[in-house]
Amino acid sequence: AVSVPVRAIYADPKVIHENDGFNEPRRWQALADVLGQSVDKLQDKVANPKRRFVYLQRQVSPAMADYVDKLDIPGIYLRRESRRYYPTGEVSAQLIGITDVDDTGVEGLERMYDEWLTGTPGSRKIRRDAKGRQVEILETTSGEEAGNLQLTIDQRIQALAYKEIKEAMIYYQSSSASAIVIDVKSGDVLAMVNAPSFNPNDRSDISPHRMRNRVITDAFEPGSSLKPLAVLTALEFGEVTPDSTVDTHPGWMRLGGSLVKDSRNYGELTLEEIIQHSSNMGTSKLALSVPKPFLLDTYYNMGLMSDTGLNMAGESSGIFHERSRWSEFELATLSFGYGISVTTAQLGRLY
């Protein structure tokens, strides 16, 4: 995101009234036309002669500002301000966030690092003569420049990830999609994308549904993507070795009257094959082979019940209802990703 210089059009009602500014109907009509307002509405805004400052329109283009300046209406002025421009558009919209008309961050990283990205304005106290001319500088306070923020995001990976989830959303006819790409060695987040998205440079059709950073806010049951944890737990506890096999015959079993089954009878499976075939039987047997506290500690230690430390507004820590008593079936279904909800960011950090 970069700050682009723009102008604001404002009025000093007192000056307008002192100069009989309303006696120039053609100029006021021209001003109303360029601002897309009626003359009556415009003049209502400046009707109170005691007011000294009223915004007529914010963040106008240089061409519009030049046109208004040439109208030369007493009491109508231009003021410098800035507007954020987002080169990546909808690709990174939820991650980067947006600012409001006063350039204050209200979403995403813009909100999180608003103070750092804004800086501190300087000030100057002056003395003027009776005609309003500056005659003396009494006091000057230096401001602080806004800081820069460099992300670990790789824009090429970001764009590719966004393209993929948009296509997947259409293919599977889903209402939303999200993805995160993490460097497994450094932990750097290389991409964080969401769909549907929005164009942060055009605020005319923004809805909360599109603004949500689902990577960190939306929790879901992860299903089979958690199965490696059951294998890891059994290995860590010492119940199995990398060369161990698990008998999944006959492809189903009953636990407390409830059925756990695979899509077919895989028979004897290695640990690697349990993951390759996404075997419910294999992961269930591994999960039930270790003490319950050890199994649950693995889930906690992998960060599935806490936020990721990104410190972004709205981040969910997932949903997990701890129980005083667990049935074998509940532990089995937990091993293949049910009875727990996690965010995309938590799942990415786990791996």
Q: Predicted segments — roles?
A:
Residues 6, 24-32, 65, 69, ...:
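Extracytoplasmic/secreted envelope proteins and their assembly/folding machinery
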Residues 9, 14-34, 116, 206-224:
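Short, solvent-exposed cationic patches
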Residues 53, 134-177:
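Conserved, well-ordered alpha-helix/loop/beta-strand core segments that scaffold catalytic motifs
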Residues 72, 103, 157, 164-186, ...:
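Flexible, solvent-exposed loop/hinge segments and secondary-structure transition points
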